[in-house]
Each structure stands twice: as C-alpha cells, then as structure tokens.
Amino acid sequence: MKIHLSLLTSLVLLSGCNAGDPVMVYESRNALQCETTGISPSESAAKLSAEDIEVTETVCGRRTGVAYPAACGMGTGTILIHKIAEADLAVAKKIGFQKVAELVDLDAGTGYEFVDCEKE
C-alpha cells in the first residue's frame, strides 16, 4: 500500500511539470529599407539551437500598429517567430528573444501578423 501511495504521489507531483508546453518567441530581423532583408529565418533559429533550444516551428512576421518612415536605411518592423518549449524561455530571453505575445497591446493598437518568408 505504501508503494502505491508513493507512486501516486509522485505521479501527481510530476503531472504539474509539463516543460514541453510551447511558447512563441521573436527577434527583429534587423532589416533595413533599400538595403537588406536582415537575418534569415534559419540564422535566427540557429541562435536558439546553439543554446540547445529545440525550435519546432519558424515563421516570419511583421509588427502592426507601429509606423515606420518610408526611407532608405530605416527599419521595417519585420520579425522572426519561433515556437519553443516554455521551459527554454529564460535562456531564449538571455540571448535576445522575447515572447511574441508581449507585442500585443490592445489599448495602443499594436500587435503582429504572420507574413510569408522569402525563399532563402
């Protein structure tokens, strides 16, 4: 009986530890109008992989609700979005990524949208 109780207690405690829940993180592409499209999706994902963070999905995006002046050398608001395990979020933040959900501010009218990535 004690073994069953210990096993049951262990299972209950471990059930709250789902390190695999996904979270979406992003970084700026650092693209400049008239000059460069910035870093590629694979280069961005490689930064996470170098920290032993598994990237399960990568998409391109664009910040919304933010004005970018139309002038060569100015930013574009394009971002790279990756799906990773929530357990890896702290490490991802240390290397410059942020949760994409933090871009959404309903009061300010800001957010993000998915866009097609150009072919690498």
PLM features: what roles do these ranges have?
Residues 96-120:
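C-terminal partner/receptor-binding element of secreted or periplasmic proteins
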Residues 30-35, 76-82:
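Second-shell loop/turn segments in exported
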Residues 14-16:
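C-terminal motif of bacterial Sec signal peptides marking the signal peptidase cleavage site
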Residues 82-89:
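Helix N-cap motif at beta-to-alpha junctions
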Residues 54-80, 113-120:
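Short, intrinsically disordered low-complexity segments
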